[in-house]
Curated annotation (Swiss-Prot):
GO terms for cellular component: cell cortex; cortical cytoskeleton; cortical microtubule cytoskeleton; cytoplasm; cytosol; preprophase band. It comes from the Eukaryota. Involved in the control of the dynamic organization of the cortical cytoskeleton. May play a role in the organization of microtubule arrays at the centrosome through interaction with centrin 1 (CEN1). It holds the Pfam family LisH_2. Residues 161-175 have a biased composition (Low complexity). Residues 248-260 have a biased composition (Basic and acidic residues). Residues 73-105 form the LisH domain. It comes from Arabidopsis thaliana. Keywords: Cytoplasm, Cytoskeleton. This is Protein TONNEAU 1a. PANTHER family: FGFR1 ONCOGENE PARTNER/LISH DOMAIN-CONTAINING PROTEIN, PROTEIN TONNEAU 1A. Residues 147-224, 236-260 are annotated as: Disordered. It is found in: Cytoplasm; Cytoplasm, Cytoskeleton. Disulfide bonds: none annotated.
């Protein structure tokens, strides 16, 4: 290979890469395919006018797609796709898509006019707005989000109602551990505690009479009366002890005087 051929190949590679980076080559390819499809369509129309057979040259989609395109939902889907291609100015792709899908040329415009008139969409909108396919997709996603939110809230409400009904049927019960705990006592002073310990040995008072609960005014009054009774009892015992000891001392003195 001589130098001239090598330079031409390098130049061809450089031009091809530059065109691919700028998107020019892809546009040329799409335009070429669109031109080929247009030429074939024109030939099909000539044959149809002369002989009358239906054009079926570019029916390359499968049977499921043909059935879908024949249904109202399928026609709307194809119209939304064509409207997006037109919005994105992918004209060559649109030229290829319609005949390859067995769709009449510009049939999507009439389909969208019917859809817009039935649903209140604006067909002639500004270029800044998105395609109708985007609006349909956003509406579907918003509807799904609202449905899920309503479903979760209804589940929470049902769970709350079931839990409240269970609580109403089964009121809370005290645990066995709390039942085994001793009753709470009100704090008392040191003198009252000593008097209480001293009075435990008496026969007139028992331990159960000193179970106090906090916040009960009647119990506090009972504690006061019991403390006063204990003090009186202790005073009586001390008085009797002093009297008996004084009598013993007196009797001993009398005996000594009698001996003398």
């Amino acid at each position: 290979m001589d130098d001239y051929t090598r330079e031409m190949m390098d130049l061809k590679t450089l031009v091809t890469r530059t065109l691919e980076k700028k998107g020019v080559l892809a546009k040329i390819r799409a335009e070429l395919r669109a031109s080929v499809f247009e030429a074939i369509e024109e030939e099909d129309r000539v044959i149809e006018n002369n002989e009358g057979p239906p054009p079926a040259l570019l029916g390359s989609c499968n049977d499921r797609a043909r059935k879908l395109h024949a249904s109202p939902s399928g026609r709307l889907l194809s119209a939304l796709i064509c409207e997006y291609l037109d919005w994105a100015q992918l004209n060559h792709t649109l030229i290829v898509y319609q005949p390859e899908s067995n769709l009449p040329k510009d049939s999507w415009k009439s389909e969208l006019r019917d859809f817009n008139s039935n649903n209140g969409f604006e067909l002639n909108r500004n270029g800044d707005s998105g395609p109708l396919l985007l609006d349909v997709l956003e509406g579907f996603l918003k509807f799904e989000s609202m449905t899920q939110g309503m479903g979760s809230s209804s589940r929470r409400d049902s769970e709350t109602e079931s839990s409240s009904s269970l609580e109403s049927r089964n009121p809370p019960r005290r645990s066995s551990a709390s039942d085994s705990l001793p009753p709470q006592r009100r704090p008392v002073s040191a003198s009252q505690a000593s008097d209480r310990r001293a009075g435990l040995s008496t026969s007139g008072y028992r331990k159960d009479e000193f179970n106090w609960r906090q916040g009960n005014q009647d119990t506090h009054e009972e504690v006061t009366r019991a403390s006063a009774a204990l003090e009186n009892l202790q005073l009586d015992r001390k008085t009797r002890n002093l009297t008996s000891s004084w009598r013993n001392v007196r009797d001993g003195t009398n005996e000594e005087e009698g001996r003398d």
